[in-house]
């Protein structure tokens, strides 16, 4: 009886401890603050998975507690001998089917969300996506706008409400491009182009970062994503085209060398003299000097 009372006293303290723990969270986690359709779909998947697993954990602990209390050894059943059994068909079917059902319940929405993230969000299929090439290097990010014929370093401007088709690649070690409030991460790799679709629902500033350790300058691989209204975005593009310097090959070679740089803006892009689909893009300087 005393054991039972002690257990329920400890159990009653659990909600209070959780409240105290959550009280230390003074702002929203970026992953749990979706600001676009891709991030919202992934957020819904996280919530569904969390609720399902929480339900499973709760059922397991309740059953464990009930069995522990109900069937514990007592003075009146010291001589109890359990019946000899060689199996229970019903129980074996249940504990085989339950895990299968759990896996199916998790797999179906996960597969649907994963495949949906590989194309333009369904809410914006009628809108032409803006194409941006993302190149990771040690230790900076290069963003090339082929249609606008401009390029930025360590910051990114996009139109709000318009899907963005990112073309991810690398001129250094493998990295991971991640804007938590807009969607999940995807790797950037030498000699490969990976597509990633993201979209910001409204104007705002969102932090992007590297999610894959790439050496001593890894902590500096953060960038700002600013979503602008269509009018402000078009105005920014025109200003860059008219006022920013050209990105020459020499300047590009200097930028991609290992090191930390600040924000840069150019009125041309390196895609005009480097083909990201070719093997040479893996290590542009190496192949250029080899020739």
UniProtKB/Swiss-Prot annotation:
Keyword Mitochondrion: no
A Gene Ontology biological process term: ATP synthesis coupled electron transport
Catalytic activity of the protein: 2 a quinol + O2 = 2 a quinone + 2 H2O
Gene Ontology cellular component terms for the protein in this record: plasma membrane
Domain of life of the source: Bacteria
Leader sequence residues: 1-28
Residue intervals passing through the bilayer: 49-69, 91-111
Cellular compartments annotated: Cell membrane
Membrane topology classification: Multi-pass membrane protein
GO terms for MF: copper ion binding; cytochrome bo3 ubiquinol oxidase activity; cytochrome-c oxidase activity; oxidoreductase activity, acting on diphenols and related substances as donors, oxygen as acceptor
Keywords: Cell membrane, Electron transport, Membrane, Oxidoreductase, Respiratory chain, Signal, Transmembrane, Transmembrane helix, Transport
Coiled coil: none
Function (record text): Catalyzes quinol oxidation with the concomitant reduction of oxygen to water. Subunit II transfers the electrons from a quinol to the binuclear center of the catalytic subunit I.
Protein family (similarity comment): Belongs to the cytochrome c oxidase subunit 2 family.
Name of the protein described by the UniProt record: Quinol oxidase subunit 2
UniProt source species: Bacillus anthracis
Gene behind this protein: qoxA
